[in-house]
């Protein structure tokens, strides 16, 4: 099965959402009459203010696969609580054999993350973060692991509500 990785491409549409294509793979289905070629695209969409979504599209041609992936990403968006352009706290995410460590960073640090994780943080609007991946570097699994970690983010107000305390008690 032949594989083809595309460079990460960015696009901003009129609705204010940022779109990035992470990868395009050429896939082959072998049938009695020969081979059937197709394409699978992986994309992320964000609003630059903490909302993020991931989509995967499959089709016989690349533009159709990318369009399907973008539409799915828009449907799967969720909100991540950010604090001054970075994460609230350190968090671990896992999907399959991919594991990621996501940590907040001081202002001026920038996005220190590799490959597909960088695209996720760019479209989400995170300016300062440190991220490390362990295990599998499959782009699909890395994006899913990153989103798993981002879903685990909680605000001080959430923690205070769970513990039955005030936000001031939680923050010290």
Curated annotation (Swiss-Prot):
Pfam families: Ribosomal_S5 (PF00333), Ribosomal_S5_C (PF03719). The keyword Ribosomal protein applies. GO terms for molecular function: rRNA binding; structural constituent of ribosome. It comes from the Bacteria. One of its GO terms (cellular component) is small ribosomal subunit. The keyword RNA-binding applies. One of its GO terms (biological process) is translation. Keywords: Ribonucleoprotein, Ribosomal protein, RNA-binding, rRNA-binding. Residues 17-80 form the S5 DRBM domain. Belongs to the universal ribosomal protein uS5 family. With S4 and S12 plays an important role in translational accuracy. Located at the back of the 30S subunit body where it stabilizes the conformation of the head with respect to the body. The N-terminal domain interacts with the head of the 30S subunit; the C-terminal domain interacts with the body and contacts protein S4. The interaction surface between S4 and S5 is involved in control of translational fidelity. Part of the 30S ribosomal subunit. Contacts proteins S4 and S8. This is Small ribosomal subunit protein uS5. It comes from Burkholderia cenocepacia (strain HI2424).
């Amino acid at each position: 099965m032949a594989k083809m990785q595309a460079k990460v491409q960015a696009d901003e549409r009129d609705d204010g959402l940022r779109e990035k294509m992470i990868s395009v793979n050429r896939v082959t289905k072998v049938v009695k009459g020969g081979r059937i070629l197709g394409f699978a695209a992986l994309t992320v969409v964000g609003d630059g203010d903490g909302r993020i979504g991931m989509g995967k599209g499959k089709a016989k041609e690349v533009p159709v696969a990318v369009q399907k992936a973008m539409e799915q990403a828009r449907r799967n968006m969720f909100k991540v609580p950010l604090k001054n352009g970075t994460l609230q706290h350190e968090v671990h995410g896992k999907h399959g054999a991919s594991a990621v460590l996501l940590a907040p960073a001081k202002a001026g640090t920038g996005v220190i993350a590799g490959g597909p994780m960088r695209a996720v943080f760019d479209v989400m609007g995170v300016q300062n973060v440190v991220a490390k991946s362990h295990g599998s570097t499959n782009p699909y699994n890395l994006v899913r692991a990153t989103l798993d970690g981002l879903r685990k983010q909680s605000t001080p107000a959430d923690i205070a509500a769970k513990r039955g305390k005030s936000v001031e008690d939680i923050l010290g």
